[in-house]
Amino acid sequence: RDCLLSRGLGDVYKRQSPNPVDIVEVDAIRTLTDAGHIVIACGGGGIPVLQQNNHLKGASGVIEKDLTAGKLAEQIDADELIILTSVEKVCLNHGKEDEEELDTISVEQAKQYMDEGHFGIYNMLPKFQASVGFIEKKEGRSALITSFDTLKDALKGKTGTVIE
């Protein structure tokens, strides 16, 4: 079977995750969030499906999880996208002598950093793509990237990377 592979770390290749086009259950998710419920949805990006006539058919693969989070936030008209990861703040030149933590940056700066290749395709790049895509769809939106352990402080503006 033909599939598109991309190079991961070292000599490892992995099947590329498709980008989300739509969230099938967005109406149910929106109803629950509007009623004040905390909804956990689209875990791991979700299972891709194809619509054939009036039926959904599962497709091989796993949807890109960060882009799915951005798509869901967009479709429920959220004001802020929060992406949790393994680091407290995003860094340029991660792990190098000239490492630089990012606090608050603009969408334009985020795009520049992506264009300059600062972020890996399997770690920070999809988080930035999701954040920028979400913010650009509607004025006044922002995105926060931080770790689960620092989320409370990040929500108070004490840490994390904010994209505006």
Language-model region placement:
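Single conserved hydrophobic/aromatic residue that forms the stacking wall/gate
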Residues: 2-13
